Structures are given as structure tokens and as C-alpha cells.
Design a protein with these regions (language model features):
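Residues that define the transmembrane beta-barrel architecture of outer-membrane proteins
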Residues: 74-76, 152-157, 185-191, 207, ...
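Transmembrane beta-strands of outer-membrane beta-barrel pores
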Residues: 84-88, 175-179, 197, 215-221, ...
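Residues on the lipid-exposed face of transmembrane beta-strands in outer-membrane beta-barrel proteins
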Residues: 69, 80-82, 159-165, 191-197, ...
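Repeated loop/turn-to-beta-strand initiation elements of outer-membrane beta-barrel proteins
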Residues: 167-171, 200-203, 260-263, 321-326, ...
Length: 344
């Protein structure tokens, strides 16, 4: 039933856009429209399997080290820190298996099954082929399966700042420019509010034990090189695929301090909304049908919402007004974070 609904949605989109097709496309056959519909379905299937592991990773990277210490900041006390995330990519998320039975338009060239990389995987030499027939001519669509970033560890930097407000509340913000990693671009920015609760328990704070809560919002954008699909109608406009992730996070932190060293733990819960879009140069096929727009409309079918529970451990050492901290977040994945902080 779900497959039937997806095919019906595709045909409806094609019919709606056909109302605007110019005169050069009036000779299109119903057969070609059905083929384009199958091509769209295959593009959505492949996109989902390819980029989902990477957007899951982005959530872990954005969730790390929001709280550098649960201790209460004085009013207007400020800190600025430089962070570096290091994410270790599991082998299971670096590849996936495709079969000819997964596709309605493409077939795997010279094979019935193949292992191809996700966005986090390595390079591949697998090709997908299909035929478009407009009733007069046939054109081959031959696409090389997308390569991954070919890295077992994904590293990226960002800046974070915090400002002490009233009654033990703290404003926290993190930001990175559009960082170019190997074969992809990544950007994260977010804002949060932390509140210190141990201030209400003086006997506990007297033992150098502190705890706090934080609520935050972050946005992660991650873009990968995707499918360079060349046809007689030009490029299909699938050269890039972007994952757009919006995350709300709540966490509680507790720490114990021994002189200059502070050991901290955290329990994190976050909920993320995932959206996707493709981009790239548009070819002559756009004169026949707005293919890229159709793909992006179809990608709405794989929008999703996920909730994660993450644990975090960290150690922080003070050197005058400078702090050095390392942390490890763990759950489905493992992400480490190293930071240098300066308190004004």
C-alpha cells in the first residue's frame, strides 16, 4: 500500500507539472512520464540510504560539550572556547547493500547486487544504468554510485561562548562557519540556556559537587557531493545532497571538583527533525520537466524525526584563566570533543 501511495504521489506531481510544460515537450509519451516517475522513486530510495547515517552523526557532533561546567557563573562573567569534535565512524554505517529489486528504473551495471558507500563511506566503482524513451529516441541514464568522504574519523572545529545572567542562569551559544571537510561542507550553530541547581543546596556545594540543567536549540547543515547524472538532456541536478537538521536538546550535568581538576557527567536527550534537498547545475531536462524541484518535493517523503539518549563524560583542568577539557559522548555512536576555554 505504501509503495502504491508513493507511485500515485509521483504521478500526481508529474501530471501537475505537465500542465506547465512548454511546446517542445508536448510530444512526451505517457511511458516517458512513468519512467521519470520511477527515476524519482529510485533517487529518493538511494538518497535516504546514502545520507541518513551522516545526519545521525551530525546530531551527535552538535550535542557534545554544551556545558563545560555545571558551576554557577557570576553575573556578566564570560567565557570563550575553541572546540574540536572527533567522530569515529562505525563500519556498519559506512556502506549498504543494493539489489536490482530495490529499483524500478535503474539496474546495477553488470551485477544484480552491490555494496555501495554511504556519505560516511569510501569510494566506489559501481554504476547504475537506465533508459528514458520519449517515443522517438532512447537516451541512457548512467550514474556512478556516490562516493563517501572516505574517512574513519570526522573532525571539525567550532567556537562556543557563554555569558552569566541572573540567578545562576547562563546563555550559551555555539557557531561554526561553513567548514569544508573532505568531499563535504558542514555548519552548525545554536543557542541554549543553562541553570545551576546546586546553588540551592549549600551543603552539597560545600563538598565541591555541582549540578545543572540545560535546554538548547541547534541547526546542523551538512552537504555532500552526490550523483553526477549526465544524460542527453543534460545534467539532472543531483550533484549535491544536503541534510538539514533541527535539534532540541535537554540535559542534566553533575560534577565533582578536586582543586584544579573537575570531573563531569551528563545525561542528554534530544529530538531532531531531518529534512533533505538536492542541488547542482540544472540541465536541459528542466525544459521538459522541473526535475530538481520534483526530487526535492519527493524528498519530503523521507523527512523524519528521531530522539536520542546520549551519555557524556568529561574532565576539565584549570591553568589560571585557561581551561583544558576533553569529553566523550556515547550512545549509538561515540564522539569525542577537545576544547580550550578562556574565562574573562
Amino acid at each position: 500500500m505504501l509503495i502504491l501511495m508513493r507511485k500515485n504521489n509521483t504521478l500526481f506531481l508529474l501530471f501537475a507539472f505537465c500542465l506547465f510544460i512548454n511546446t517542445s515537450a508536448k510530444g512526451q509519451t505517457v511511458q516517458m512520464l512513468e519512467q521519470i516517475g520511477h527515476l524519482l522513486d529510485d533517487a529518493i530510495f538511494y538518497s535516504d540510504r546514502y545520507i541518513t547515517p551522516a545526519t545521525d552523526v551530525a546530531v551527535y557532533q552538535a550535542s557534545s560539550n554544551w556545558v563545560t561546567t555545571p558551576k554557577k557563573k557570576k553575573l556578566w562573567e564570560t567565557s570563550l572556547s575553541f572546540h574540536t569534535n572527533a567522530f569515529f565512524v562505525p563500519k556498519s554505517d559506512r556502506k549498504f547493500t543494493i539489489n536490482n529489486s530495490d529499483f524500478s528504473f535503474f539496474t546495477i551495471e553488470n551485477a544484480s547486487t552491490a555494496i555501495v558507500p554511504t556519505a560516511l563511506g569510501n569510494n566506489t566503482q559501481v554504476w547504475l544504468v537506465g533508459q528514458l524513451d520519449d517515443g522517438q529516441n532512447q537516451t541512457q541514464v548512467r550514474v556512478k554510485a556516490a562516493n563517501g568522504i572516505n574517512q574513519e574519523t570526522v573532525i571539525y572545529p567550532y567556537l562556543q561562548a557563554s555569558l552569566g545572567l541572573w540567578h545562576g542562569t547562563e546563555l550559551v551559544a555555539k557557531y561554526s562557519t561553513n567548514v569544508k571537510l573532505k568531499k563535504c561542507h558542514y555548519q552548525v550553530y545554536g543557542i541554549g540556556l543553562k541553570h545551576n541547581f546546586s546553588q540551592y543546596f549549600k551543603k552539597i556545594e560545600a563538598k565541591n559537587i555541582y549540578f545543572s540543567g540545560l535546554i538548547s536549540y541547534s541547526k546542523e547543515d551538512i552537504t555532500f557531493n552526490f550523483l553526477d547524472a549526465q544524460t542527453d538532456y543534460g545534467n539532472l541536478g543531483l550533484n549535491e545532497i544536503t541534510g538539514l537538521v533541527d535539534t532540541w536538546q535537554f540535559q542534566i550535568n553533575a560534577s565533582k571538583q578536586w582543586k584544579r581538576f573537575e570531573l563531569m557527567s551528563a545525561l542528554i536527550s534530544n529530538t531532531s527533525d531531518f529534512k533533505y534537498e538536492v542541488g547542482g547545475p540544472k540541465g536541459q531536462i528542466e525544459d521538459l520537466i522541473p526535475f530538481q524541484s520534483l526530487v526535492n518535493k519527493k524528498l519530503e517523503e523521507i523527512y523524519k524525526t528521531k530522539t536520542n539518549w546520549i551519555g557524556e563524560l568529561s574532565g576539565r583542568y584549570q591553568i589560571s584563566k585557561i581551561y583544558v577539557q576533553t569529553s566523550v559522548a556515547f550512545g549509538k555512536f561515540v564522539n569525542s570533543n577537545f576544547s580550550i576555554q578562556y574565562e574573562f
